[in-house]
């Protein structure tokens, strides 16, 4: 029997209708796997070993009573076959410390999804720079002069922090916006932090598409997150509306270009954000939208694809 651990935000406060981590747990349990639950505060390192307080977990599709805990254990993480790192951003120093603890388990044979080193290496905003032919024109800088010049070149730009999620602190700045200076000051904290600028993509009105890639294989359906009236952000957390649809030709092209590199880096479950035919983000920490896509296209099991990939990788380790 496969022992699966998960590191996540408190399961007591999730929305099971939309939570991707919960969908993963349901599928793992359906396969008879043993579930071990952890939060960030349960992880620790002793004598060079990653360890944790874990609780045995049962889950069920019941909006009033979706989980129960069993026995509590204190164990070395290498006792688990696989660990899903599903802690939501912020990607801060605490998150980085957790990846080092998980990496000690990986060094002793545990499969960690996603690979701890790659979680550190592949910043969700910056990793797109490795694929400049697929992205909008992009500037990363602390300098107000650089950002102003970029704004003059394009006239209509998006400014965002490098560590945000869910559409927080994303600004659209048009040609004669009187707030440009204060937005730059706010995002860069008076030129002390890097931020990202990209040319505005009018195709956002058709949706910001979340394309999932599982162990190098693009899922054939995506979730287009369509901005609310008067908004430029499609994120569901910012009031966007989700619409599942098949991948377009350009979605396939982008996903197939990026997928082999993701697989090679041990990034087994990844969410690409695509606007029109441009790649805007590569989400590696805790990608979502599985529930919405599976609800619209029941013939696809994304969590099934993931658990199959985990089984394959575990079999390869033993071979």
Swiss-Prot record:
It is an enzyme of class 6 (ligase). ATP binds at residues 151-207. Mg(2+) binds at residues 281, 283. GO terms for cellular component: cytoplasm. The keyword Manganese applies. Keywords: ATP-binding, Glutathione biosynthesis, Ligase, Magnesium, Manganese, Metal-binding, Nucleotide-binding. Its cofactor is Mg(2+); Mn(2+). Binds 1 Mg(2+) or Mn(2+) ion per subunit. Its EC number is 6.3.2.3. Belongs to the prokaryotic GSH synthase family. This is Glutathione synthetase.
